[in-house]
Amino acid sequence: MSIAAERKAEVIKTNARKDGDTGSPEVQVAILSERIANLTAHFKTHVKDNHSRRGLLKLVSTRRSLLDYVKKRDEARYKALLEKHNIRR
């Protein structure tokens, strides 16, 4: 499931490292986390929706790859991301 444009803009604004930043790993992880949360809520009512579940697994995998990249570059940023978005590791 996608997120509304205004919600996406809000997520970008709160997680951007500088003005106009949409591509940093922090912003990408935040957007993916928002989409993952939306899909998780969707699965509470639509338990048998296996096609969307596959999409959820792809999103989680992409977020994991981005987090691994951040961890390799800067451990402090990685820990801050985990803390901010309540991601288990």
Curated annotation (Swiss-Prot):
Q: Name one GO molecular function term.
A: rRNA binding
Query: Quaternary structure?
Result: Part of the 30S ribosomal subunit. Forms a bridge to the 50S subunit in the 70S ribosome, contacting the 23S rRNA.
Q: Name one GO cellular component term.
A: cytosolic small ribosomal subunit
Q: Which PROSITE patterns match?
A: RIBOSOMAL_S15 (PS00362)
Q: Which family does it belong to?
A: Belongs to the universal ribosomal protein uS15 family.
Q: From start to end residue, where is composition biased (Basic and acidic residues)? A: 1-21
Function recorded in the entry: One of the primary rRNA binding proteins, it binds directly to 16S rRNA where it helps nucleate assembly of the platform of the 30S subunit by binding and bridging several RNA helices of the 16S rRNA.
Single Gene Ontology BP annotation = translation
Q: Is Ribosomal protein among the key words of this record?
A: yes
UniProt-annotated stretches for the region Disordered: 1-24
Question: Which keywords does the record carry?
Answer: Ribonucleoprotein, Ribosomal protein, RNA-binding, rRNA-binding
Top-level taxon of origin? Bacteria
Q: What is this protein called?
A: Small ribosomal subunit protein uS15
